[in-house]
Amino acid sequence: MCLGAVFVLGGVGMAVSQVSSAYPNLCKLITGWVKTSLPEDFPFSSLQINYNYAARKHVDGNNIGPSYIRSLGKHTGSELWTVDAFVEATDEDTGEKYVKGGGGQQVLSCSGGWKLFNGNAEHYTKPYQGTRISFIAFSHNAYNKLSTRVASKLKELGFTAASDDGVDLPYFAKYRIDKSEFTPDENSK
């Protein structure tokens, strides 16, 4: 189940998920909990909630990259394997610290707290036993290209990455790939 921003096929485009619209109070309760437990500077437009689901190896296609995962419930196992861990880096121009890929394979324990991972790198859930509910906070790569109505509704529901201005939030600026200098053939890759 995905709360928040989703891409709807059939010409609809970016929208508020049906479950978010159908259960706005539940959505506000969950986003409120997420905002109080995540690092305060992490913006998110969407929340994926899974019940007893172990994701196979995949890459998140519409995710700008940085994602936080946490699992709840009485279970053992369920770590997240990722092919490319984030490592801390420093911007040469500003001296500002940020995270980037390049850390190599990593296994993250998702129980008991939020763990940062790169949704654009291959990842999967390791086997587990018991009851497991996982929450993944992320931002859709079109979080800043929403209609005014959709952006407003997402903010009302508690999502912190939703706009119609096309400008990246500072947190995400380093993760956006600028393809404007590539040839058309390179852009299709």
What are the residue ranges of the model-derived segments?
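Catalytic core of non-heme Fe(II) oxygenases with the double-stranded beta-helix
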Residues: 26, 39-128, 132-146
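A general marker of short, structured functional hotspots
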Residues: 3, 19, 54, 167-171
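Double-stranded beta-helix
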Residues: 130-188
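Polar low-complexity intrinsically disordered regions enriched in Ser/Thr and small residues
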Residues: 7, 13-16, 76, 98, ...
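Extended non-catalytic scaffolding segments
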Residues: 1-2, 6-7, 13-14, 176-189
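Non-heme Fe(II)/2-oxoglutarate
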Residues: 1-41
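Intrinsically disordered, compositionally biased terminal peptides
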Residues: 2-5, 32-33, 80, 159, ...
